[in-house]
């Protein structure tokens, strides 16, 4: 993406920075989804079978076609849309606030990565204990970052995209623009699904 931008005359440090942040986020997401079996043949998010059973096959297919598939695509577009606002500020130097927000994004990404690992370790240990016939306690992770919050990874994910929205705002001096829709809709999605 950065190569094409340079080749087409869109070279800009701000756009490069945003591209790097999105790529790092995507790498974490890809790794985490893959290790849970998401890329195996027939693999899917653990919530879909639960929802499919709750709704029944016909209602689930309708829900999938009218909400899940379109919403995810629109949401991915909207959370990345602040890049468009950043592009409008191309050619201006990066501001200190943008660099501070980029650092905060990386801290949140690290926070989410640690939470993901803690959750992974917990579920691996829980499965091993079940297989050995040992008690697993209440079944909830309550140590590490999960001692602070039931969903520290969700907090970090939502916060990253609010920070991502704020970066181009810092570049343009425009505190509010249409691309806020991505952060708002992501927040609503997490709120509605937990």
Short names for language-model regions:
Residues 62, 68-72, 78:
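Voltage-sensing domain
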Residues 3-29, 33, 73-118, 123, ...:
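Hydrophobic transmembrane alpha-helices
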Residues 31-44:
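Juxtamembrane interfacial secondary-structure elements that flank transmembrane helices
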Residues 1, 41-67, 135-146:
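Juxtamembrane helix-capping/reentrant segments at transmembrane boundaries
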